[in-house]
Amino acid sequence: MGNLESAEGVPGEPPSVPLLLPPGKMPMPEPCELEERFALVLSSMNLPPDKARLLRQYDNEKKWDLICDQERFQVKNPPHTYIQKLQSFLDPSVTRKKFRRRVQESTKVLRELEISLRTNHIGWVREFLNDENKGLDVLVDYLSFAQCSVMFDFEGLESGDDGAFDKLRSWSRSIEDLQPPSALSAPFTNSLARSARQSVLRYSTLPGRRALKNSRLVSQKDDVHVCILCLRAIMNYQYGFNLVMSHPHAVNEIALSLNNKNPRTKALVLELLAAVCLVRGGHEIILAAFDNFKEVCKELHRFEKLMEYFRNEDSNIDFMVACMQFINIVVHSVEDMNFRVHLQYEFTKLGLEEFLQKSRHTESEKLQVQIQAYLDNVFDVGGLLEDAETKNVALEKVEELEEHVSHLTEKLLDLENENMMRVAELEKQLLQREKELESIKETYENTSHQVHTLRRLIKEKEEAFQRRCHLEPNVRGLESVDSEALARVGPAELSEGMPPSDLDLLAPAPPPEEVLPLPPPPAPPLPPPPPPLPDKCPPAPPLPGAAPSVVLTVGLSAIRIKKPIKTKFRLPVFNWTALKPNQISGTVFSELDDEKILEDLDLDKFEELFKTKAQGPALDLICSKNKTAQKAASKVTLLEANRAKNLAITLRKAGRSAEEICRAIHTFDLQTLPVDFVECLMRFLPTEAEVKLLRQYERERQPLEELAAEDRFMLLFSKVERLTQRMAGMAFLGNFQDNLQMLTPQLNAIIAASASVKSSQKLKQMLEIILALGNYMNSSKRGAVYGFKLQSLDLLLDTKSTDRKMTLLHFIALTVKEKYPDLANFWHELHFVEKAAAVSLENVLLDVKELGRGMELIRRECSIHDNSVLRNFLSTNEGKLDKLQRDAKTAEEAYNAVVRYFGESPKTTPPSVFFPVFVRFIRSYKEAEQENEARKKQEEVMREKQLAQEAKKLDAKTPSQRNKWQQQELIAELRRRQAKEHRPVYEGKDGTIEDIITVLKSVPFTARTAKRGSRFFCDAAHHDESNC
């Protein structure tokens, strides 16, 4: 691609534009040669890998067509041709007449160079910029030469003035002041210093008068404008951009081009500089260039000339738009807020805001958009100050709201405890009613049995009476016959001829009222139970509504053996802990029918998701708080030193005398002695050894004043009657309410949670679904089970589908949503399980027993001392303790019942193990629901994308047609690129400068695009040509 080779082969003669050679097609070469030539064509295109890979899939015919198309575009001139031409324009030895003749074609040569830089392949551009040709240096030198007379034109100087030459030399030397050495990295700084020294030598050798006249001739043409276009084309490559950014004079010369009289050139320069500002590291380089501009042009303030041009060029809208866009970007593309305010203030001092107020009503819509974009980005410092004050007010308001929320949280906690207490009370009443109902049922059964027995006896009595009535006439007849016979025979003869038993039969019968039937004999004992079944046929609980199968009798309960389930695929094993058949009776699992659930589930989907890939210590008891420190001292004076020191500290905290303390202990006065002090004082109960020493000291009648204050206190302290019991009683009195308030919510939580878990019908149905799916998975390997341990619920997340994207719990949540939507909020029936999970029931029961012992201690003390404080305490709190003890018994019974109901043992399963199972299950179930919803939304998005892609590819249904469509599209795109003058943007960072300029023309810059993530290039100093 590039300029066509002309017939003369002389650079600069014909216009350098891409033209097609005659369309005669050459015969196709051998395949090896064809591949070599095709590879060269691909490398010259600089295509991205995906499109190059697609071109390599062409057949030989299409490859040859592409080679022929590309070879019709031949590079007209090599890079050194243009470089030699530009160097000839800079030759100081050329006469003025000869220079006039040469300079006529300078603009034309520059235009051809710009087209070549824009349209030729990357190899041509690299050759132009390499160390041998140094095309960038030549371009920058020519640009500097083309505008060296501009300074004199602005100062109104004519050639021949010695002061002008001094100013010229000063201008050339000022190029050294690019920016402070610390502003750029070491490679930039070293290159800058070395090149700046060379630049000073170059400018100092320029013949002043002749060079000034030649420069004036060049400045009257479009050479500066085209030079900027050449530099823009070079910077559009990542490789060229890095070279321009690291060049010590290039950006400075571009900025100095703003002094050109052509508004179109100024607009081009500002567009390019604005694009560089948006490149990471570019903003600092642009500011350094304007610092250099200030020194060269003798500005009092930076950007002074720029604002002057902005105000004066009001007739050229394109320049004003470009200028406003550059000011917006150079001010607001930095991240540091303080620096943005500083740059903003620079332009404010130069009168930008006043000018914008005048220009806001301009007829140009583009200029209005740029002005509004700048105003939208402006930092209003006053507004920021108001915002800061508003923030402080808001923070104070937040503190008030947080305090209010804290109060509301406390109130909510109190309401929750009240609610839990009410629920627990209702549950206790329900349990009591259930007990009463069981008692009534038992009484009813006994009464029914007695009534049945009485009815049977009455019926038997009636039957016997009827038989007797029926037999009485016969008996009377027989009696009359017998009487007659006896009368004839005589009693003596009769008795001699009959046995005794027959004589009894002839005895007169008793009257009917005295005949009562005997009760039936007792029922025979039940037969012994048969021996247990072998392990291969485990018994099962009865399944209501299931098909009839083998029923085995074990004791008094019958269980039905579950038939194995045949699955289409092998399924993973669900490693649950199954309950034994003899553990099922009386549990929740005896009420479940998992076989009925299987009829409702989508088992085909379940098997497809979960088929295997390969197909073919007991708690420590808390001792009582009221321990006494029994440290035996073998050898002591009166009190051991450390013990006396600690006692003194404790007594100072109380601020009471020893007499006041002992008097308060006598009267159980907790107003004088707070309970905290009593508990501290209990650590200093006198030991037996200390009491002996104190008594001996007293018997010796030694003066008490010689004792230390601690010893005197201990002497009085030890004389208190029943000191240990009194101290323990005071501690109990002081802590009773706190203990009551602490234990009651825990017992209520256990009662409420136990009752709600046991009575939850939705939880039972959830377990039924889990049991059904688990049996379905395990039936072919382990056989069906009748129940499982609750810890098995944690394994639902470990059983994953074939693609590892879904767990068994996710499938259960999906099934519940589709088949059983009423169960979706099953956790609403489980009340206070989280609170119950934090309760140690064993410790709570021990604390209740401890309170009972403490209350018994108070009763004994009250019976001994008859103290009003103790009497009032007993009358007030005995009922509360009784209620607490009843609640403790109810909580224990309710918990034991619910644990046994789920097939667990209360001895091995405390509440801290039982209830957290449900807490974890609920939390995991909710997360599974959320993940299912997220997966559903993602699938819908993917489905919409797929439908959109299918709609676009209606004409490409088969793979061959799709490849053919892609190839045709790529060929058309390549031909469009060849016909255009703009260099195509392929991949990487190439083409970014053009992209930035294009975007900025369509969308005004806002401060949000200045964030680090929106930078277009990485730091240019850290890129070498391998990154291009």
Swiss-Prot record:
Residues 26-472 form the GBD/FH3 domain. Plays a role in the regulation of cell morphology and cytoskeletal organization. Required in the control of cell shape and migration. Required for developmental angiogenesis. In this process, required for microtubule reorganization and for efficient endothelial cell elongation. In quiescent endothelial cells, triggers rearrangement of the actin cytoskeleton, but does not alter microtubule alignement. This is Formin-like protein 3. InterPro entries: ARM-like, ARM-type_fold, FH2_Formin, FH2_Formin_sf, FH3_dom, FMNL_animal, GBD/FH3_dom, GTPase-bd. Residues 561-951 form the FH2 domain. Keywords: Angiogenesis, Cell membrane, Cytoplasm, Developmental protein, Lipoprotein, Membrane, Myristate, Phosphoprotein. The modification Phosphoserine is found at S174, S1014. Coiled coil: none annotated.
